[in-house]
Amino acid sequence: MVELTLATLLGTVAGDFCELRNEGRPVLESVLLAYSKANDQYGGKNVRNVISGSFGLEAQAISFVVTKCPDKL
């Protein structure tokens, strides 16, 4: 199994977040659903490990979303 990286996780979550926002869902609902999908895809323990070991997570997450769908934040 390939090790989950922060870049992979954020890319997945940002893509799902943008899709959900395009459907008209609120920001918080979109974040929670995208995170939930990542847990399903990569496993909750893997997601938690990547998040807990990350530096500057908030800034990196925002930059992924702004790159993928700048009008959705």
Task: Give the label of every model feature segment.
Residues E29-L73:
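Compact alpha-helical subdomains of small soluble proteins
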